[in-house]
A protein has these predicted regions:
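Catalytic Zn2+-binding segment of zinc metalloproteases
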Residues: 312-328
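Fold-level signature of zinc-dependent metallopeptidase catalytic domains
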Residues: 151-207, 220-230
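Active-site-proximal segments of metallohydrolase catalytic domains
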Residues: 215-291
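Beta-strand-enriched, solvent-exposed domains that form extended recognition/catalytic surfaces
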Residues: 26-150
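Bacterial Sec-dependent N-terminal signal peptides
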Residues: 1-22
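Short pre-active-site segment immediately N-terminal to the catalytic Zn-binding motif
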Residues: 189-192, 287-311
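Solvent-exposed loop/turn segments at secondary-structure junctions
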Residues: 183-186, 224-228, 282-286, 302-304, ...
Length: 423
């Protein structure tokens, strides 16, 4: 009798979990456009626009769980019951900009776009931004009623042309990635498709992507630009491109990004996507990856393949940079706070990281010696800090472009994320 009751409880629990998406959501995407603005002392979040597009390509399970903590979170609550029915995490260029000196002198605004499943009933949506001490810096809550006549319908007609590059084994439980062309004229789209093939080959040469390839759906979106290439402000070069990308972001010559997130998602409206890889038609070195926002990389440099994979580590799984600068403007990771990223530590709470992968008698910190070259340890120098922040192995795809693979800790983190979305 006890076994029967236990079976009923487990079955009912699983049934409720399976039904939770259909209980609260329709098979459509609610795209919410925000403006984040302010300076180092005061930040503000404002609602810009609401949009609805056909089908939902994000997670259908574990709706109220976060894949990783991130530097910000979006939470959807049922208005009547106050139950949390969807959550996701993210990072933004706005938060990164706040760490630069310019943020001490002036205010700026940044576009941000988030996707959630379209609710069946009224919901309360909260956006939280956190500082580098993992404290909530600013919070904003607003209400969305699905019948609002000002919710703009997009992606139902006149979709951007796209090519299916990879078909998953199970289209109902897969990870949807969209490559999008930036700085490619219409006549250059065959080149773009070849560039997508090249970087896909690089990504799926790395574990765990290689062994879990059948869990991914990939499309190549042929967004045309009037000009070929990308803008280079330091050289006085400005191009008219689909996403208005440019080098010199935050006055860093190799930092290649786009600030036009509404344009990005307009091009993608109605197309199967959740994660985004932007390929920029340039042979100059540069790129950037932002958690659950986008990965943007140059397409025609000798290091394109490792850079695209590295930046996807950021945008897809929230992995931290494992390299260090001799001189950094502001420490990104306070040494008295444990970072949320799984591949770096300050040793404040090392048990929450890769302590279980450390072999007995391993010195902590671990000496950077030839004998320890392939050994999981605690090596000083990571997260842009020479001192006080540590990485799992001497080298990794998240540290250099030369290392051929992700380290053991990063592979585990990536595997966990893939399972999170697909199991």
């Amino acid at each position: 009798m006890k076994k029967i009751c236990l079976f009923i409880v487990i079955f009912t629990s699983l049934q409720l979990k399976a039904q939770s998406f259909d209980e609260y959501f329709t098979d459509n995407t609610l795209r919410i456009d925000y403006i984040f603005s302010g300076d180092v002392n005061h930040q503000q979040i404002a609602l810009d626009k609401l949009n609805c597009s056909p089908h939902w390509y994000g997670k259908h399970k574990r709706l109220s769980e976060l894949p990783v903590e991130g530097n910000g979170q979006i939470t959807v609550r049922d208005h009547k019951s106050k139950a949390v029915i969807y959550r996701n995490s993210f990072s933004t260029l706005f938060q990164e900009w706040l760490s630069y000196d310019e943020a001490k002198k002036t205010s700026r605004s940044f576009e941000n776009v988030f996707l959630v499943p379209m609710p069946k009933d009224t919901v309360d949506i909260t956006i939280e931004l956190k500082n580098n001490r993992r404290e909530t810096q600013v919070s904003f809550t607003h209400q969305v009623t699905p019948g609002d006549i000002l919710i703009r319908k997009i992606g139902y007609n006149n979709r951007t042309p796209f090519v299916q590059m990879l078909t998953p084994k199970d289209s109902t439980n897969c990870i949807h990635i969209a490559y999008i062309a930036e700085g490619y004229q219409t006549s250059e789209m065959p080149t773009f498709i070849n560039d997508v093939k090249n970087t896909m080959e690089a990504l799926f040469a790395h574990e765990p992507f290689k062994s879990m390839k059948d869990r991914f759906s990939i499309v190549a979106v042929e967004a045309p630009s009037k000009d070929s290439g990308t803008s280079e402000p330091s050289k006085g070069i400005w191009k008219n491109t689909a996403l208005s990308s440019h080098f010199d972001t935050f006055y860093s010559d190799r930092y290649l990004t786009t600030l036009n997130l509404k344009d990005l998602h307009d091009w993608l409206a109605g197309i199967p996507y959740e994660h985004i890889i932007v390929l920029v038609n340039t042979n100059h070195y540069g790129g950037g990856g932002i958690l659950n926002s986008y990965n943007l990389s140059m397409a025609h440099h000798r290091l394109t393949r490792p850079v695209v994979v590295h930046e996807f580590g950021h945008s897809f799984a929230g992995l931290a940079d494992e390299y260090a600068y001799e001189a950094e403007q502001i420490p990104m990771y306070p040494h008295d706070i444990e970072p949320w990223e799984e591949n770096i530590t300050t040793l404040v709470d090392f048990k929450s990281k890769w302590n279980d992968l450390i072999k007995k008698n391993t010195l902590i910190p671990t000496p950077t010696t030839p004998a320890n070259k392939n050994k999981v340890g605690v090596y000083e120098g990571a997260g842009y800090s020479v001192k006080g922040v540590y990485r799992p192995m001497q080298d990794c795809r998240m540290r250099t472009n030369e290392n051929p693979e992700f380290c053991d800790v990063c592979r585990r983190a990536l595997t966990k994320i893939i399972d999170f979305y697909t199991k």
